[in-house]
A protein has these predicted regions:
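Conserved hydrolase catalytic core segment
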Residues: 112-154
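Conserved HGGG/HGGXW glycine-rich cap/lid loop of the alpha/beta-hydrolase fold
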Residues: 29-85, 89
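Bacterial Sec-dependent N-terminal signal peptides
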Residues: 1-23
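Active-site loop/oxyanion-hole signature of alpha/beta-hydrolase fold enzymes
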Residues: 77-121
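Glycine-rich His-Gly loop
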Residues: 47-51, 120, 250
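Flexible "cap/lid" loop of the alpha/beta hydrolase fold
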Residues: 140-176, 217, 221
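Short beta-strand/loop motif that positions the catalytic acidic residue
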Residues: 241, 247-250
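Alpha/beta-hydrolase
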Residues: 171-236, 242-243
């Protein structure tokens, strides 16, 4: 067999192995052992998924793509997925502790600095982390982030992009849930219509609806309450942050 052909095969297999290389582990933090996964080699990049209250599984595909150039880290935020907590309450579920979790994970993995990519709520957490630990970041990426303060919440309308039929159906099933209908069918219908708010192509809505069913509503509520309690705003810190920042929206 041609030696050049063998070399090409070896190079292909080596690059494929590097991209697909995955390791898992647990990083101790305050009151929780954080489950994490790493992909690829290179400069470290941590992905903070949205929510709050969701595990990191929905971002494994993105992690594998980015692993072609970076060492990508996913982690289950406290109380989600495999980052199990014995008790969840307002003292154990705060933005301050979630920032401490990120620092604990960075130190556990031995990185001096890393790129932080936060999506949706993950962008809010990424901003808050950057405000408190700017030296730990090489760069900050905010993907469809909630912003640098709570201004967005004053005008946010989840149903804005829904059709009239979708909006009516979502509001109907939401009312059913509020009235005490806890059946799996009612929950599935509510998620099915809610998912249409997050996509431009409704063909992708079923995948989003499935993902919405993986969330922990208690964690979601506690963190949003904590954001209100602390008066979340990183405007002052943003003015002095000197690392590269990429904002992705649309």
């Amino acid at each position: 067999m041609d030696k050049r052909f063998l070399l090409l095969i070896w190079l292909f297999l080596s690059s494929t192995a590097a991209i697909g290389q995955t390791s898992t582990g647990f990083a101790p933090s305050e009151g929780v052992d954080l489950y994490y996964e790493t992909y690829g080699e290179g400069q470290p990049m941590v992905i903070i998924n949205g929510g709050p209250g969701f595990n990191c599984k929905g971002f494994q595909g993105l992690a594998k793509r980015l692993a072609q150039q970076y060492r990508v880290i996913l982690y289950d935020q406290r109380g989600t997925g495999r980052s199990v907590m014995e008790q969840i309450d307002s003292t154990r579920m705060t933005m301050g502790l979630m920032v401490a979790d990120l620092e604990a994970l960075r130190k556990h993995l031995g990185f001096q600095e890393w790129t932080v990519l936060g999506h949706s709520f993950g962008g809010i957490l990424g901003n808050y982390y950057a405000a408190q630990h700017p030296a730990s970041l090489k760069a900050l990426i905010a993907s469809a982030s909630g912003g640098i303060d709570l201004t967005l919440l004053r005008s946010f309308d989840l149903t804005q992009r829904m059709t009239t039929a979708q909006r009516d159906s979502f509001q109907y099933w939401t009312a059913q849930a509020s009235a005490g209908d806890t059946s799996a069918w009612a929950d599935a219908r509510r998620r099915a219509f809610m998912a249409t708010a997050y996509v431009y192509d409704d063909a992708h809505a079923p995948r989003v609806a499935e993902r919405l069913g993986q969330g922990n509503p208690q964690i979601n509520q506690l963190i949003w309450q904590d954001l209100q309690r602390i008066g979340y705003s990183v405007q002052a810190a943003a003015g002095t942050f000197e690392k590269p920042v990429l904002v992705i929206q649309g």
